[in-house]
Amino acid sequence: MPQVKVTASAPCSSANLGSGFDTLAIALDAFHDRVTISDHDGFKLTGEGIPLDPERNTAGLAAIALLDELGLERDIEIRIEKGVPKGLGLGSSGASAAAAVKALDAYFGLGLTQEEMIGYAMIGEIASSGSPHPDNVSASIIGGLVLVTHDDDLRASRINISGDYRFLVAIPDLFTENKTRAARQMLPRSIPLDSYSKALGRTASLIAGLMSGNRNLIRVGMNDDIVEPSRISLFPYYYDMKRMALANEAVAAAVSGAGPSILMVCDEMSDMDSIRAGISEIFSRYNITGRVIEARMSGGAFVEGSPVSD
C-alpha cells in the first residue's frame, strides 16, 4: 500500500574529477534537490523553473522508467524543489532523478538496491544529456566518492577516503542551453592508445591517492589531457584558475562535470583565502561574474524523517 506522501532529498555532485570521465563522482553538501511523491489521479509533475513534460525532465523520465518496468500505476504527483543550480556542472539533473527514485522507492515500499535505483535514475539523465550516464546519479544516491563501472552490468562502489578535505567550487554566472548535451558532443570519438594508457594511470593514481591520503598522487590523478581540453571553449579561464589554485597549495583542481564550475580540493596545507581571492581576480580578468562556495563531502539521498548516514 503506497504511503500518503514521501519527500526525499539528494545532494549535488561533481563528476569526472579530472581523469575519471563517466566513472568517478563525489557528492557535495553545498546544494540539494527535494522531490515529493503523493497520490494523484494520473501522472503530474509540478515545480518552478523546470520542464513539466515528463519526457523532458530527468525526475519525470526516471519515474516513468521505474513505474513502467515494475508495472505500477502512474497515479502520482511528483513535486520537484530545485536547490541545485542548473547548467553549472554540479549534477543538477542527476540530483533530481536521484531524489525522485529514492522517494518512489520509499513511497511504494519497493526495497530497491542501490544499483537498481541508479539504473532508473540514470535513464532520467537522457532528458538532460541525451545519454544515460551513471556518475552523477550514483554519487547523489550513494554519497561520498563513488566509482562506477558500466559494461554488461552496472556496478557502483563507494570509496573510503583518507584525509579531511574541503572543496572550493568556483561558480561563474554562465549558462549554456543544453550544456551537458553540447559538451558531450565536443568529445573526441577516438583517442590514441598512449593517451588511453596515460589516462588510466592517472585515474588509478587518483583513487590510490584518495584512499591513502597521498596528495601528490591526487594531484597527478586529477590531470586530464582528453576531455577537459576538448571542452575548453566552455571555460577559457580554467587553466589560469588551476595554476593559481595549485600555487596556493590546493591539493588538486579540475573542471566539475561538464563545467563551467571548477572544483578545487583543499586540505590543511591549502591557503583557501588566497585561492578565493584568486578566483575572484580571474573571473574579473575574464569579465565574468561569479561566486565561490565551500563544500564538504556529503552523504547520499535520504527520505526526510528517516535516519541519515554520512
UniProtKB/Swiss-Prot annotation:
Keywords: Amino-acid biosynthesis, ATP-binding, Cytoplasm, Kinase, Nucleotide-binding, Threonine biosynthesis, Transferase. GO terms for biological process: threonine biosynthetic process. Its main location: cytoplasm. ATP binds at residues 85-95. Its EC number is 2.7.1.39. Pathway: Amino-acid biosynthesis; L-threonine biosynthesis; L-threonine from L-aspartate: step 4/5. The keyword Ion transport does not apply. It catalyses: L-homoserine + ATP = O-phospho-L-homoserine + ADP + H(+). It is found in: Cytoplasm. It comes from the Archaea. Pfam families: GHMP_kinases_C, GHMP_kinases_N. GO terms for cellular component: cytoplasm. GO terms for molecular function: ATP binding; homoserine kinase activity. Belongs to the GHMP kinase family. Homoserine kinase subfamily. NCBIfam families: PRK01212.1-4, thrB. Catalyzes the ATP-dependent phosphorylation of L-homoserine to L-homoserine phosphate. HAMAP family: Homoser_kinase. PANTHER family: HOMOSERINE KINASE, HOMOSERINE/4-DIPHOSPHOCYTIDYL-2-C-METHYL-D-ERYTHRITOL KINASE. This is Homoserine kinase.
